[in-house]
């Protein structure tokens, strides 16, 4: 009863998407996040796969339906956690290059302070591992370094390796 029983249930990890519209689910997730911040003293939280919380297929523009309850949950939790734990950092691993993820909720966004910038890692990784200068794009490196969500250099987290980048037999840089 705490998971969707329709098309919204499907994720790449099975039919396991929680029903973000249920008050019990929302409260459980909020209480869990607060526990990490309050009892364990975490300085922030990184939310995994937020695109799968807010969309059925996990990709903006792929034709899959949005999940309004998921978008509402992200906004609600960021509002609540920011109010209760000022100065903590909330980061989305959204991977869709969607600037609304880091817009404040009062401006229609999800309210995260930063999000992972997947485009950065791919441009830098290609430049570093390319065996030939002919295939290396310094313009792509420049664009990756200069990119900003909402005009802010602090709205993104850049990285050259992550658990996703080196998993499943992929090589490290």
Where are each of the predicted segments found?
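Substrate-binding/active-site clefts of carbohydrate-active enzymes
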Residues: 1-66, 77
